[in-house]
Every structure is written in C-alpha cells, then in structure tokens.
Curated annotation (Swiss-Prot):
HAMAP family per UniProt: Adenylate_kinase_Adk
Main location group: cytoplasm
Family matches, as Gene3D superfamilies: P-loop containing nucleotide triphosphate hydrolases
Family (UniProt): Belongs to the adenylate kinase family.
GO biological process: AMP salvage
Its job: Catalyzes the reversible transfer of the terminal phosphate group between ATP and AMP. Plays an important role in cellular energy homeostasis and in adenine nucleotide metabolism.
Residues involved in AMP binding: 31, 36, 57-59, 85-88, 92, 156, 167
Region (LID): 122-159
Region: NMP, residue numbers: 30-59
PANTHER family in alphabetical order: NUCLEOTIDE KINASE
Stated name of the protein: Adenylate kinase
Length: 216
C-alpha cells in the first residue's frame, strides 16, 4: 500500500504517519531523508544531487522523481510506503503520475487554520530537557516555568503565530491544490487512488481510527 498523507503543518500528520507505518509495516519516506541517503551512498544520482545542493540550487522535480523511483524499488518498500511531505506541488504530483509511480490511497487530514494556530502558538518548551507544554491543553503548574526545574519555558520561533500563519499561507497556495488534483484523479480512474477526507479535530485515538478505517 502506497499512501500520501496531506494536511497543513500542525494538522497532526506526523502522529498519524507513525500509526500508519506501524499498522501496515511500511517505511515512511521523506524527500529530505532520501536526499541525504543518496548523497551519502554516493550513487550516480547522489553525486548529481550533491552538485546541485553544493551550488545552493533547488533540486529539480525530475531529480526528486528519479530519487523516489530509486527509493521505492528497495526491498523495504515491497509492501508499500508512506510519502511524507511529498508531493508538495501539482508539477510534482503530475510528474509522479507520468513516471508511473502508482499511489493506492491519499488521506487528507483537514484542520481549520485557527485551530492550528491555537495548537502551535500555544506550545512552550523547556530547552534543556525537551519537555513540552501547551498554555491551553497542557499548562505548566507555574505560568512560563518548567514543572521540574522551575526554569523558563520558551516559545520556539517555528511556533510563533506569524510564522505559523506564513507556513499556512504557503500550504494553501502550494500544497492545498493537491487535494483537488487527487480528488479528480481518483474520480477519473475509478477510485484509484482511494481519496479520503478526515476531520483532524478530536482525540488522537478517534482520528487514528478514522485514518485506519479509510485505509482498510
């Protein structure tokens, strides 16, 4: 089973990806991991990628698709894989179709922007230990202080509201159109890939149950 998980940053894709990979015994594939592995392995494609990256250029969709095809041919992908953060754009999705990379299921985890802003902007971290809190869902005993050490908690730059809103706007302009793309592809191909829209609000268990039901 080859699965693409779609959803805005903060929608809970990482949590659900973990359940999917464990349930189906498939690896999670991210372009970042693939790029690093190919460069490290020194394959012909890896050397080509290294040249591009060393020059500070963006890796072309063609190279990324070649990388995907090389990766999914490996033994651990025999039963499928879960694509993490790929494809991000319509040209990448079209290139996958053109390259004959079949996808079995596309799952969209939909969460309202304001809910995501609340989730992410409320996070606080104790840097030394990595302990995380949330001002609304999991507040520290003393505001702004770590429960165990009493040291200050910080808000990571990634979690600041303006950063979250910027990432959401990039998602809506670049990646959200994939929802439409895969819905149309599914309709045109007699339901392949199977497309599922899941509301990502509620308990983790409830959302996981919906995701796994969509994939069964």
């Amino acid at each position: 089973m080859r699965v693409i998980l779609l959803g805005a940053p903060g929608a809970g894709k990482g949590t659900q990806a973990k359940f999917i990979t464990e349930k189906f015994g498939i690896p999670q594939i991210s372009t970042g991991d693939m790029l690093r592995a190919a460069v490290k392995a020194g394959t012909p494609l890896g050397l080509e990628l290294k040249k591009v990256m060393d020059a500070g250029q963006l890796v072309s969709d063609e190279l990324i698709i070649s990388l995907v095809k090389e990766r999914i041919a490996q033994p651990d992908c025999a039963n499928g894989c879960l694509f993490d953060g790929f494809p991000r754009t319509i040209p990448q999705a079209e290139a996958m179709v053109a390259a004959g990379v079949d996808i079995d299921a596309v799952v969209e985890i939909a969460v309202d922007d304001e809910e995501i802003v609340g989730r992410m902007a409320g996070r606080r971290v104790h840097l030394a230990s990595g302990r995380t809190y949330h001002i609304q869902y999991n507040p520290p005993k003393v505001e702004g202080k770590d429960d165990e050490t009493g040291e200050d908690l910080i808000q990571r730059d990634d979690d600041k509201e303006e950063t979250v809103r910027h990432r959401l706007s990039v998602y809506h302009s670049q990646t959200k159109p994939l929802v439409d793309f895969y819905q149309k592809l599914s309709a045109a191909n007699g339901g392949k890939p199977k497309y599922s829209h899941i509301e990502g609000v509620g308990s983790v268990e409830a959302i996981t149950a919906k995701v796994l039901a969509a994939l069964s």
